[in-house]
Amino acid sequence: MGSQIIHNSQKPHVVCVPYPAQGHINPMMRVAKLLHARGFYVTFVNTVYNHNRFLRSRGSNALDGLPSFRFESIADGLPETDMDATQDITALCESTMKNCLAPFRELLQRINAGDNVPPVSCIVSDGCMSFTLDVAEELGVPEVLFWTTSGCAFLAYLHFYLFIEKGLCPLKDESYLTKEYLEDTVIDFIPTMKNVKLKDIPSFIRTTNPDDVMISFALRETERAKRASAIILNTFDDLEHDVVHAMQSILPPVYSVGPLHLLANREIEEGSEIGMMSSNLWKEEMECLDWLDTKTQNSVIYINFGSITVLSVKQLVEFAWGLAGSGKEFLWVIRPDLVAGEEAMVPPDFLMETKDRSMLASWCPQEKVLSHPAIGGFLTHCGWNSILESLSCGVPMVCWPFFADQQMNCKFCCDEWDVGIEIGGDVKREEVEAVVRELMDGEKGKKMREKAVEWQRLAEKATEHKLGSSVMNFETVVSKFLLGQKSQD
């Protein structure tokens, strides 16, 4: 009897497993913090590579955690390196798929054998780390999969099998990679999606290799998603209701629980121990906020291509001179590894010409930057976190998608949500200059800003009180799935 009482008094224990890239770790950290605030004991599992990057960027105590929020790590199976760069995504996907199951199983066995922590009662895993499902099933605990892409991109991934059936993938040869073919090929078989072209589909589809790793990975992970207890998406009902509704017939229950940064901000004090826990792999330069404080409202364009995008030297130079030619003030985040294979260096004469109206940083607190009154526009790679943060702050966008879900995100930003203007893939300084001016000063830019402010209102409505759609959905996922009884063998 006594042992039963002790067992019932133990906290539920969630193991959170993000895919090991910055844009996946941040939203998973928010989910983990929200669960911790609801009384869960949290184990947050990074790869050894990223665990070591955290320690280098944030100090040796950065991952000490709290008594009920612990960090663990598992090997990703790739050769060890000390570089502070984003790993090759294809190699990482292949390696996690093949190599992570055994170390993850061993980690959970070790946790469950310990005396000082409650037994693992549920798992929340990135949708791209579905090997975790095998362990959840072995333990008889529920698993919620978190797909960190947009709903529209996830729906496209769910239909990749049809591209193969219809002979659209792989492409027959390199000649099909032309702009004309990608723009002229209409895709009319994804539910709810209209006027979609092959160029808008997540970029992994653009392969001539019948054994392409990323196609195999997408097919495998979307198929395995059907085994989850439930699926959560970092979006909100007003933004992607039709898309999410279309998934419900082919998947376990799907819930919109975003924007997660708004949900977390509403519930977690920034200055609290849990609030101060950071998940950034790069050290943020806070000075950019001081610089923005000296600028007038809506006067600055912010440029950040995220944590994975790489540019050629030529593209970097074209962006630089386009920004210079626009005459606008700008804050530009240039990661050290932004240029493929070498250090990212902008032309010295560009620096001289723009020194009185620009600030360059290697990384910054993006959410704080986008919410700053001085920011009037955002030149973005269309990563989903960036788009959600921009919409949540009412900031319109210039869109330059790089890979993966970003093409689809760009399409919806520009054509469905009316908050974006696209720049062509082969960057030209004249186009950059013209589009930045249109965004900041033009009639189209003004309409986009008004629309962005409307989306801001709807994002806040979904997250700011207990009747918000995302708040209610999050509570449902917690009570119905994560706190549900262990499944019986």
Swiss-Prot record:
Report keywords, A-Z: Glycosyltransferase, Transferase
Q: What is its EC number?
A: 2.4.1.-
Name the PROSITE patterns on file.
UDPGT
Gene3D superfamilies reported in the protein's UniProt record: Glycogen Phosphorylase B (3.40.50.2000)
Q: List the disulfide bonds.
A: none
What tissues contain this protein?
Answer: Expressed in root tips, lateral root initials, root apex, shoots, leaf periphery, leaf primordia and flowers.
- Top enzyme class, one word, equals transferase
Instruction: Report the Pfam families cross-referenced here.
Output: UDPGT
Q: At which positions is UDP-alpha-D-glucose bound?
A: 307, 364-366, 381-389, 403-406
Task: Give the Gene Ontology MF terms in alphabetical order.
Answer: cis-zeatin O-beta-D-glucosyltransferase activity; glucuronosyltransferase activity; trans-zeatin O-beta-D-glucosyltransferase activity
Q: Which family does it belong to?
A: Belongs to the UDP-glycosyltransferase family.
PANTHER family attached to this UniProt entry: GLUCOSYL/GLUCURONOSYL TRANSFERASES, UDP-GLYCOSYLTRANSFERASE 85A1-RELATED
Q: What does this protein do?
A: Involved in the O-glucosylation of trans-zeatin and dihydrozeatin. Also active in vitro on cis-zeatin. Not active on N-glucosylated substrates.
Q: What is this protein called?
A: UDP-glycosyltransferase 85A1
Gene name linked to the record = UGT85A1
